[in-house]
Regions:
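A short, N-terminal "cap"/entry segment at the start of jelly-roll beta-barrel domains
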Residues: 1-31
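Conserved short histidine dyad/triad with adjacent acidic residue
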Residues: 20, 35-50
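Active-site region of the double-stranded beta-helix
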Residues: 24-32, 45-47, 53, 59
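Short, surface-exposed secondary-structure edge patches
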Residues: 36, 55, 70-72
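Short acidic-glycine-tyrosine-enriched beta hairpin
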Residues: 69-81
Length: 81
């Protein structure tokens, strides 16, 4: 049975916590995963590799993103792959 398909607002699906990173898995399949992350100011993920390309979309504030040796600032409403 397939799960119910319906639109949702990303902003309302994100949960925030003080001094934490909160993650919420939306889809997890062998072909890829969609996970929402909420970072409190100053929180970060350690450098890592992943089996799939990653799309980062900033829905609130801004984020410093490092891809290889390049660093980017991604702001509210922007995305980077």
């Amino acid at each position: 049975m397939e799960s119910e398909v319906k639109p949702f607002l990303t902003e309302s699906a994100v949960e925030y916590a003080t001094q934490s990173i909160v993650s919420k898995t939306i889809i997890k399949k062998s072909t890829g995963t969609v996970t929402l992350f909420a970072f409190d100011k100053g929180e970060q993920l350690s450098e890592h590799t992943a089996p799939f390309e990653a799309l980062v979309q900033v829905i609130d504030g801004e984020a410093g993103i490092k891809i290889g040796s390049n660093e980017y600032v991604v702001r509210h409403g922007e995305a980077i792959i």
